[in-house]
Every structure is written in structure tokens, then in C-alpha cells.
Amino acid sequence: VLFQARTRGDVFYRSKIEPFSAILTGSVGKDPGYDPLAFVVEECHKRGMESHAWIVALPLGGRKHVTSLGARSVVKKQPAITISYKREYFLDPGHPDTKEYMMKLVREVVENYDVDGVHFDYLRYPEHAGTRFPDTRGFRIYGKGRSLAAWRRDNLTDILRHLYKGVKAMKPWVKVSTSPVGKYDDTSRYSSQGWNAYDAVHQDV
């Protein structure tokens, strides 16, 4: 069972880093009276099933959602590692501290819960962002002679590698997986051109 433990800067477990999602109670940060992730893990294991924590990696939601999270939003706590783009907020894949922030979240889950795996969704750049995605400053600092597209692909790979190594250092038996776009690159045999992992969202994993 893949259980969504993190949505967009809010969570479905007792966290010291990000607030409880309002989905369960109607109020951001309100404890629902039980720990949803702990419940899922326990019930899965009773039935001989694995339980994996599904984590939405980079999207943080729109302005209204981010505002609703208040002071516990990462946009408020660590604005340097976030980017606003098309009325949405994202963790900035090009900032070195982003992978450390994500590792804190993952460590909290892996150390405190008997999960069998951690799964990352939306570990990608917004679709067809091109030069409109405002990461020019980071590219100037950290690009090191690479093209913008290559740098972005490397950023995502570096994040995933860092998280994988961190999980395996804590609990080698915990599985690490991700949800890349299903089509790696365009091919001449198919009519669906332009929507792919490699160019459209800079995934090379």
C-alpha cells in the first residue's frame, strides 16, 4: 500500500517539521486524534502487506494553500529554498539546501515509522518551464559550465541520490522508489511529441 504521507507542504503524520493537512479535520495543523501513517503501517503489517510512504516532493501548492499553512510553511521558514512560478510555490531543486530539507522530512518518517518503503512523486520541474522558471540566479551560481537543461536534470538526480543514500544509511531494508514521467523521450514512431521526462520536466532518473 502506498500511503500519501505528504501532500504540498503538509502531512498525514505527526511531524515536527510540517503541519497536519487540513483534509482530515478542516483545520491546518489540527491533530485528528490518531496518527494516520502509523495506523496504515500497523494495519498493513497485520495483513502481511507492505506500507510505503508516498511523498509529494517539490510542489508546495498555490498562494491560498501556502498562506493557510501559516508560519509552519517552508515558504515562510526557509524562503531561500522555494520558488514562486505561475501562482504556485515549489521547493527549488537547484538550491543545495533543498535536498537537506527533504532529507529531514524523510528521516522523520523512516526513523519514527516502520515503513517498508519511501516513494517520491512530482520529483520534477514544472512542465515546459524553459527559461520562464525563475532559477536563473541558482544556475549562475551552481551551473558550472553545464547547459540549463543538463543542470536541472543533474539537480533532480542529485536530490534522489541524496535521499536514497540517506534512507539506506538509516535502514538498508527500506525501499526507495519514484514516479517519473512514463515516456523518457520522444520517438518518431509515436505522435505524442513534447511530453516526456527528459526534456519536458528534466528527469533523467
Description of each model-found segment:
Residues 11-25, 59-86, 123-144, 189-196:
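Aromatic- and acidic-residue-enriched segments that line the glycan-binding/catalytic groove
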Residues 28-32, 93-97, 101, 147-158, ...:
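Alpha-helix N-cap and loop-to-helix initiation/capping positions
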